[in-house]
């Protein structure tokens, strides 16, 4: 991922209202779709909370302070300060902390971008899946920034609190296999692993 500037991508407006509020992008769905849409969003948000690096309501300034001394590639997800968006990724780049909005439309999440590029960006049913995709994509850092370009890497999440040993083990297992039900483990433990199938 590449940014031409290290300037924040969203303004430091007041705290956003909760997702699903009247007038937000998700409210454009037909009336018959609203319960299903709400259920999808609720499931996505619950999964995001389970990840441990969703900070909820946090201003641009607070995110910058949290990331200021972190290594490049450290990131967190928070509620967007912009009323048209649900969430924002705040990440430490080589030029300092910056922000990238997450767009939600027609039941899919994708990174916000300029119109001519937006249609080419991958879309995901899950915020965590979106983050995982870009974390894995950023593992091979072969490009060298040039011409004032700032490359944006997602490497390491900034947790709200230290994750439990169980959760860390779950992530490690996910990095090794996706065949959870083939593992010689008790069913209850397999169910726990199934609750979070990501590598980040």
Model-inferred region functions:
Residues 39-45, 96-98, 102-115:
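Short aromatic-glycine-(Arg/Gly/Cys) micro-motifs in beta-strand/loop hairpins
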Residues 101-106, 113-200:
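Cullin-RING E3 adaptor/co-adaptor recruitment helices
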Residues 73-97:
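Short, structured protein-protein interaction patches enriched in aromatics and acidic/basic residues
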Residues 35-65:
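Eukaryotic proteins' extreme N-terminal regulatory segments
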């Amino acid at each position: 991922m590449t940014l031409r500037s290290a300037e924040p991508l969203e303004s430091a407006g007041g705290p956003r209202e909760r997702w699903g509020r009247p007038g937000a992008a998700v409210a454009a769905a037909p009336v018959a779709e609203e319960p299903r849409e709400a259920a999808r969003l609720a499931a996505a948000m619950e999964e995001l909370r389970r990840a441990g690096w969703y900070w909820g309501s946090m201003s641009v300034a607070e995110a910058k302070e949290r990331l200021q001394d972190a290594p490049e590639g450290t990131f967190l997800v928070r509620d967007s300060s912009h009323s048209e968006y649900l969430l924002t990724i705040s990440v430490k780049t080589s030029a300092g902390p910056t922000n990238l909005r997450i767009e939600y439309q027609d039941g899919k999440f994708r990174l916000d971008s300029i119109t001519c590029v937006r249609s080419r960006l991958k879309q995901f049913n899950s915020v965590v899946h979106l983050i995982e995709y870009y974390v894995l994509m950023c593992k091979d850092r072969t490009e060298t920034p040039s011409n004032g370009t700032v490359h944006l890497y997602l490497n390491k999440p900034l947790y709200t609190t230290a994750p439990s040993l169980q959760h860390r083990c779950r992530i490690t297992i996910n990095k090794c296999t996706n065949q959870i039900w083939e593992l010689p483990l008790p069913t209850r433990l397999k169910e726990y692993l199934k609750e979070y199938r990501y590598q980040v």
